[in-house]
Amino acid sequence: MAKHVRMHQLQKLTLRSLPPASVLVSSSRCFSVLNRPPPNYEGHIPLTRTERLGLALGSGIGSFLDPQRGDLIASFGEATAQPYFIYKLRDRMLLNPTGRRILRDRPRLTSTSLDIPRLRNLPPNTVGYAYAAWLDREGVSPDTRAAVQYIDDEECAYVMQRYRECHDFYHALVGLPVFREGEVALKAFEFANTGLPMTGLAVFSAFTLKKAEWRRFWDIYGPWATRNGAQSDDVINVYWEEELETDIDKLRERLGIEKPPDLRAMRKAEREARKKEKETKGTMVGAAT
């Protein structure tokens, strides 16, 4: 019964959010490169279906070949998120009390709004301290997230912006670093949790990992990401600004997320093991001669 009620609520929310059919038909008939409609919000760039397809293909191939191109990853994320996936993610926020508050308040995650110096002075077990420490360790800033341009619906554009700005909190929550191996693992988690196509494409870059990295992803981090992303609560519904002084272990427990093995420590241990093995072989060769 509860499942039917939930589905009914979701249908009402989806129908309420869609524009009238007459508007859809009219805009479809008139929209072309030479007759582009006005933007729906500041910075919005309306695209035709052909333009959106071209953007998705070009940015998708480019970001697969060079995962460091954040601009291409952002463009691919927007080009593939609508008309379906970003609406589904928005509807999951609407069905959650905290998600609805986030959509109403429209908070932004920046170095100014978060007061990073204050977070550095919080107790070490808090979310805020872990987030600031992760930023410092990885050398990144919350102010580098690109503004959304290609999502047509203004509310859904905010959902995509919120997802981008929360990404570093996901890193800090699970302790994964920013280099490729860590990003692939986190993107796999995000794909299982959010369903956004861009995060799924990023998982395919696992095929570009080195042999040892691929083995770790296949044996450890891939299964961890799939299991935890699917079983945990929707991380898009976390009001991070209100959780900064929360114990990070308790937040993971509340969300149903297991912390994965320390990737940096694992890589370091493997490097030291290889170094020791190499030194041992060198000693044996020297003794033999």
UniProtKB/Swiss-Prot annotation:
Topology class, membrane: Peripheral membrane protein
Compartments, record wording: Mitochondrion inner membrane
Record keywords: Lyase, Membrane, Metal-binding, Mitochondrion, Mitochondrion inner membrane, Transit peptide, Ubiquinone biosynthesis, Zinc
Segments for region (Disordered): 266-289
Catalytic activity: a 4-hydroxy-3-methoxy-5-(all-trans-polyprenyl)benzoate + H(+) = a 2-methoxy-6-(all-trans-polyprenyl)phenol + CO2
Transit peptide limits: 1-31
Family of this protein: Belongs to the COQ4 family.
Name listed for the protein in its UniProt record: Ubiquinone biosynthesis protein coq4, mitochondrial
